[in-house]
From Swiss-Prot:
Entry GO terms, CC: extracellular region
Organism whose genome encodes this protein: Mus musculus
Assembly mode: Forms a 1:1 stoichiometric complex with pancreatic lipase.
Protein known as: Colipase
GO BP: digestion; lipid catabolic process; response to bacterium; retinoid metabolic process
Stated family: Belongs to the colipase family.
Pfam families documented for this protein: Colipase (PF01114), Colipase_C (PF02740)
Biological function: Colipase is a cofactor of pancreatic lipase. It allows the lipase to anchor itself to the lipid-water interface. Without colipase the enzyme is washed off by bile salts, which have an inhibitory effect on the lipase.
Tissue specificity annotation: Expressed by the pancreas.
Lineage: Eukaryota, Metazoa, Chordata, Craniata, Vertebrata
């Protein structure tokens, strides 16, 4: 019995020591990796081009790029804007459900001047 416990402990230590670094398998995913939800991505944007397309982590939208203000499902057709930008566009309940509320990323500080 003691030998089994020692073997189990050694096995657990070996698995814990061999665990990958900061690059994740389920969370902390880099751009281009397959994702199921935006919370898995370092960039916080999991995007797919079509409803049947494979979703991948990608960078957030830059200024004057198409964007989605929010998603109900955690996967975007267009990523939200980078920090400091706002997604200006039409918003509707149907668009929120179908994930088609698109806009353009604008710098609100620059547009007020």
């Amino acid at each position: 019995m003691e030998k089994v416990l020692v073997l189990l402990l050694v096995s657990l230590l070996a698995v814990a020591y061999a665990a990958p670094g900061p690059r994740g398998l389920i969370i902390n995913l880099e751009d281009g990796e397959i994702c199921l939800n935006s919370m898995q991505c370092k960039s916080r944007c999991c995007q797919h081009d079509t409803i049947l397309g494979i979703a991948r982590c990608t960078h957030k939208a830059m200024e004057n790029s198409e964007c989605s203000p929010k998603t109900l499902y955690g996967i975007y057709y267009r990523c939200p804007c980078e920090r400091g930008l706002t997604c200006e566009g039409d918003r509707s309940i149907i668009g929120a459900i179908t994930n088609t509320n698109y806009g353009i990323c604008l710098d609100s500080r620059r547009s007020k001047q």
